[in-house]
Every structure is written in C-alpha cells, then in structure tokens.
Amino acid sequence: MTVSTPSKPHICRFPPGADPDVINQAFREDGVVILEGFLTPAQVDKVNCEMKPHLAKVRGGNMRYGPMDTSLETTLEPERRRIHNLAGLSETFRQDILNHPLMHELSRRVFSEFGDYWQYAGSVIDCAPGTPDQFLHRDQPAQKLFNVGPDAPEGFINFLTALTDFTKTNGATRFVWGSHRDWIDKSDENHPIVVAEVKAGDSLFFSGKIVHGGSFNGTNDTYRSSVALPIVPCIMTPYEANIHIPRSTVETMTPLAQRMIGWRSACLPDPYAIGTWTLNMNELGEQMGLKSKGYLEN
C-alpha cells in the first residue's frame, strides 16, 4: 500500500491497529504523523493522576533543587514547565508506555541500521495559559556528527503524546512542512506551517529533523500537557540518567523496558553485532543478577 502526500499539506492520521510499515512510510515522507489512540482514555487518566502532585509543585513555582548553569530548565519560559524522571515517577510510563508495541515497531524500523535503541528522556511538558510561541527548532542534536542534512540517517525520533486535547487556541504543536527534507529553518510559501490538533491519547510521531515548536496558549484557564518520549539509537548517550531508580522498582519492569532506561545492555547491528553498555563484556542485567517481569528479548 502506498501513502501519497496530499498536495495541500496535511498530517496523516492513523487509527489503532494501522500497519506499522504504512505508518513508517508516511513518517519518512512527511516527517510527522499522528497516531490516534496511542494511549487509551484509562491510561491518560492514570498518567494525569500520577502527575497531579508533581504538576502542582511546578505550577506553584516550587523547585527542590536550583538548576545548574547548563540545565535545560534555564531555557524555559516561566509558563512552560517540564517534569522529568517519568520512569521513576509513573507506573504507567514504566509498564505501558515503555512497552508500547507500536512504539517499538516504529523505533525498530527507524533505527534498524543502528541496532538497538533506548529512551533519550521521559518527561511531561506542561504549558500554562499565556505560554508564548516556542522558538522553532529541530530536536536532532546539532553536533556535526548528526547535523549532516536530510539524507543522513535518523538520529532522533519523538513520540509526543497528548494528555489533554491540543487545539490552535491552547497552543498545539506547529511544524514547518517539508523542513526535514529541504533542510530549511523557517516557513515560506513552499513550506507552510501546519498545526497538529489532536485529542488526549493521540501521539505525534515525528523526526528529529523536522522544524517545529509549541504555539501560544491563548486560553485563560487551560493547561496543555503531554508526555514526551524521544528515542535515540544505542550509540547515543541519553539525556536522562536512570541510575537513581531503586532496583526494587526496576525489577518490576520488563527486560525491554529495563533496556529502554539503561539497565540492560543493547546490541549493535551486523556485521559487528556485539553488545554495548555491558559489564564484563556480557549482558549488564544478567551480570548484576537483575530480576525482571518477563524474559529478556533477543
């Protein structure tokens, strides 16, 4: 089946159960797709419940630690808050999102030439009323190793899942159409801005190469929240460390989810298919005697 990009820019939407190969083709062509019902209403409610006390703290301006000089936090507008360490804070993130079948089907297809992959970070992004337009940017790291143009392999993908509805009024994410292909940094008549309005539970699956940014939240009382799950190949260092998560918590996770947060080894592809992130040249979890929920996948 062929997915054709419409003449008028429009983000393709895929219902639950859609063919991952078709989704991946549209992703490669357009740089962004919408995965409808990525999380169920019950999962959305559970994440929102788990995050409620943490959101109350950041919305109140209460910070436990002062940011380091190079912290991402120093770049955020006062209205835009982030809660990181979801693997430590959210059971739904650990058990459901990190094991999401479609997320893994798509990640495997994108990063097949690199071998395994893991999470770059897991966070909730919370945008209060009055949050200004976010500057347009690419997520893929700007270092020369990765910033080599549209024909380079994908080095970064993101699953941005709405915890509330995204509308033009409350600041839905906007994308510069075709910017992942033509390597431009701002919109023009051939690369218009396309706004992604989605329902809670839908996920924006997009390339690290596409230029995008959140929009102005022009409401008086609506917070716009989402779970951001960026994924990178295992040859890249994650943004977030997870060594602080209690072992007893990690051992409630599947081996696949454990690998996603760096508690298991990853594997490089053929012809040099050896493990990486190892202990004594062998699988990290096995060497540590790490227990898990289920069995280690090959």
Curated annotation (Swiss-Prot):
- Kindly list the biological process annotations in GO that this record carries: novofumigatonin biosynthetic process
Entry superkingdom: Eukaryota
Which residues take part in binding Fe cation?
A: 137, 139, 212
The EC number on file is: 1.14.11.-
User: Which InterPro entries does UniProt cross-reference here?
Assistant: Phytyl_CoA_dOase-like
Q: Which cofactor does it need?
A: Fe cation
Q: In which pathway does it act?
A: Secondary metabolite biosynthesis; terpenoid biosynthesis
Which GO terms of the molecular function aspect are on file? Answer: dioxygenase activity; metal ion binding; oxidoreductase activity
Keywords noted in UniProt: Dioxygenase, Iron, Metal-binding, Oxidoreductase
Assembly and interactions?
Homodimer.
Q: Which family does it belong to?
A: Belongs to the PhyH family.
**Under which name does UniProt file this protein?**
Fe(II)/2-oxoglutarate-dependent dioxygenase nvfF
Protein source organism: Aspergillus novofumigatus (strain IBT 16806)
Gene symbol here is nvfF
